[in-house]
UniProtKB/Swiss-Prot annotation:
Regulation: Inhibited by intracellular coagulation inhibitor 2/LICI-2 and to a lesser extent by intracellular coagulation inhibitor 3/LICI-3.
Name the UniProt record assigns to this protein: Proclotting enzyme
Catalytic residues identified in the record: 172 (charge relay system), 228 (charge relay system), 326 (charge relay system)
Species, as recorded: Tachypleus tridentatus (Japanese horseshoe crab)
Similarity remark: Belongs to the peptidase S1 family. CLIP subfamily.
Any one GO cellular component localisation term in the record: transport vesicle
PTM notes: Proteolytically cleaved into its mature active form by serine protease factor B. Cleavage produces a 25 kDa light chain containing the CLIP domain and a catalytic 31 kDa heavy chain which remain covalently associated through an interchain disulfide bond. Proteolytically cleaved by clotting factor G subunit beta.
Modified residues (Pyrrolidone carboxylic acid): 30
Assembly with partners or alone: In the active form, heterodimer of a light chain and a heavy chain; disulfide-linked. Forms a covalent heterodimer with intracellular coagulation inhibitor 2/LICI-2.
Top-level EC class: hydrolase
Record flagged with keyword Hydrolase: yes
Length: 375
């Protein structure tokens, strides 16, 4: 009887719109961990899991058609999946606040040297299960940042190519150990198009560039990683190829969006465990972004998590950016497929420590600074 009621409420009235709903579902669920919970939220549910409607008794017991219909987050065949609340608290459709639309606000300032084409990646993969080796050439803006110390040149951080002359990385990657001064530009170099740091026969054909200018945020604080962003200017113009091209900056898209619960990608050559060995090959992982308040509470004994920070990771740990991933990109695709740089790997408690997400510099909070300094 329950099954029949559910189908009469949801499935049959929606058959005429199943194509539209399925398309929206794919857009929402395109980049997910199939082995992890599919997190979701809507105006009825602050935090939920996208699951088969028959498995969500909390919503079924409400006997509210509009609530069920507007909670749809996907389909299993023709059976709807709904955003099922993690707690028993869920408001009815008559109590829910009205849906709002946001008018796109014009950006205050846009760098004149942004590329016309950006964010085009080279993989058909739409999901990552845990951390894994990235396909060769999948992330063509990924940058290895080298530092020469004591005559030895080694990868210390990651970065993201954003124009044909500029790489964005973390401020803590470019300052001295005291965090007081920027290291000279000639100790830095970058490598584009790399896959395996220690192999020359992996078909990646990387290219090295010297760095002529290093600009870090003038109000960077090493103790709290506040304003953890820097721009490297390369000595020559980068010729874009299928394996080397820039990621988009969120000037016209994502700038004012609430990114909580979204699942961006992070890439790097960092260690796969705290104090463990570095990875020779580029690795990728996909992590959910935390609600700001949850992140603030997680770190409230350590520092004040303001709006310039963004947190991502699983509450039970297990997957995270790690040592050596610093400065690397947090990347989110838009509906048209282009990837945007929304975060910079900054810091965390060890690596994937339960209860403590990784912390990232929120790029949308620094777009005016980038426009001013990326010349």
């Amino acid at each position: 009887m329950l099954v029949n009621n559910v189908f009469s409420l949801l499935c049959f009235p929606l058959l005429m719109s199943v194509v539209r709903c399925s398309t929206l579902s794919r857009q929402r669920r395109q980049f997910v961990f199939p082995d992890e919970e599919e997190l979701c939220s809507n105006r009825f549910t602050e935090e939920g899991t996208c699951k088969n409607v028959l498995d969500c008794r909390i919503l079924l017991q409400k006997n509210d058609y509009n609530l069920l219909k507007e909670s749809i987050c996907g389909f299993e065949g023709i059976t709807p999946k709904v955003c099922c609340p993690k707690s028993s608290h869920v408001i009815s459709s008559t109590q829910a606040p009205p849906e709002t639309t946001t008018t796109e606000r014009p950006p205050k300032q846009i760098p004149p040297n942004l590329p016309e084409v950006c964010g085009i990646h080279n993989t058909t993969t739409t999901r990552i299960i845990g951390g894994r080796e990235a396909p060769i050439g999948a992330w063509p803006w990924m940058t290895a940042v080298y530092i020469k110390q004591g005559g030895i040149r080694s990868v210390q951080c990651g970065g993201a190519l954003v124009t044909n002359r500029h790489v964005i990385t973390a401020s803590h990657c470019v300052v001295n150990s005291a965090g007081t001064d920027v290291m000279p530009a000639d100790v830095f170099s970058v490598r584009l198009g790399e896959h395996n740091l220690y192999s020359t026969d992996d078909d990646s054909n990387p290219i090295d560039f010297a760095v002529t200018s290093v600009k870090h945020h003038e109000h960077f604080v090493l103790a709290t990683y506040l304003n953890d962003i820097a721009i490297l200017t390369l000595n020559d113009t980068v010729t874009f190829t299928d394996r080397i091209r820039p990621i988009c900056l969120p000037y016209r898209k994502l700038r004012y969006d609430d990114l909580a619960m979204r699942k961006p990608f992070i890439t790097g050559w960092g260690t796969t465990a705290f104090n463990g060995p570095s990875s020779a090959v580029l690795r990728e992982v996909q992590l959910p972004i935390w609600e700001h308040e949850a992140c603030r509470q997680a770190y409230e004994k350590d520092l004040n998590i303001t709006n310039v920070y963004m947190c991502a990771g699983f509450a039970d740990g297990g997957k995270d950016a790690c040592q050596g991933d610093s400065g690397g990109p947090m990347m989110l695709p838009v509906k048209t497929g282009e990837f945007y740089l929304i975060g910079i790997v900054s810091f965390g408690k060890k690596c994937a420590l339960p209860g403590f997400p990784g912390v990232y510099t929120k790029v949308t909070e620094f777009l005016d600074w980038i426009a001013e300094h990326m010349v």
